[in-house]
């Protein structure tokens, strides 16, 4: 056997043994009663005033803990925080405006227990409070405002765990972000 083939064979044996070590101790069980997860991601947010057609970058973080078994899944409770920004230039009138949203809230979700190792799918509702700094830039007669508003929505998401503690996560919905992707960490 030549040296290159030996190196490839040793690497393959190492990779297989590493994957068996990562998954040792049974199947990946993403969410169960008593588990804690933390999500952090980036996405597309929207402003909450005006026509709702504007999108901008957003940062979102959330945590959840498994509370109750319900059928093949688990009900979780947790919290979330989102920061989003939107800016628009109305070229016809040469007028700029911008929104900066901070949303803090509680969330509840139902995590369905598929028989696919590492997969977690869920849907839920957030409730909270939002703070919006709105500036009308150079529009004559407007100085902007900073309202506080109630916040509610709906979301659907999925996580896939590569190990017992780390995975990827994505959510869509009418939420503090319309879509986001990030990482998920399972603490317990």
Feature names for model-found ranges:
Residues 1-27:
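Bacterial Sec-dependent N-terminal signal peptides
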Residues 20-68, 180-188:
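Short glycine/proline- and aromatic-enriched beta-strand/turn motifs that initiate or cap beta-hairpins
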Residues 25-35, 51, 68-75, 113-121, ...:
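Short loop/turn motifs that connect adjacent beta-strands in outer-membrane beta-barrel proteins
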Residues 29, 47-54, 70, 91-97, ...:
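Outer-membrane beta-barrel domain signature
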Residues 34-38, 53-59, 98-104, 119, ...:
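Residues that define the transmembrane beta-barrel architecture of outer-membrane proteins
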Residues 38-50, 81-83, 125-127, 163-176:
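Transmembrane beta-strand segments that form the barrel wall of outer-membrane beta-barrel proteins
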Residues 46, 57-136, 187:
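Gram-negative (and chloroplast) outer-membrane scaffold detector with strong preference
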Residues 110-120, 130-188:
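Gram-negative outer-membrane beta-barrel domains
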């Amino acid at each position: 056997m030549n040296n290159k083939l030996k190196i490839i064979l040793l690497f393959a044996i190492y990779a297989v043994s590493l994957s068996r070590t990562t998954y040792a101790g049974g199947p990946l069980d993403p969410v169960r009663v008593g588990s804690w997860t933390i999500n952090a991601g980036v996405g597309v947010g929207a402003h909450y005033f005006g026509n709702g057609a504007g999108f901008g970058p957003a940062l979102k973080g959330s945590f959840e803990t498994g509370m109750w078994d319900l059928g093949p899944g688990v009900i979780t409770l947790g919290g979330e925080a989102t920061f989003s920004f939107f800016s628009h230039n109305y070229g016809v009138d040469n007028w700029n405006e911008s929104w900066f949203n901070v949303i803090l809230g509680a969330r509840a979700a139902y995590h369905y227990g598929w028989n696919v190792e590492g997969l977690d799918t869920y849907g839920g509702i957030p409730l909270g409070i939002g703070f919006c700094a709105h500036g009308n830039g150079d529009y004559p007669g407007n100085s902007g405002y900073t309202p506080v508003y109630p916040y509610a929505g709906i979301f659907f998401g999925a996580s896939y765990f590569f190990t017992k503690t780390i995975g990827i996560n994505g959510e869509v919905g009418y939420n503090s972000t319309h879509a986001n992707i990030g990482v998920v960490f399972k603490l317990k």
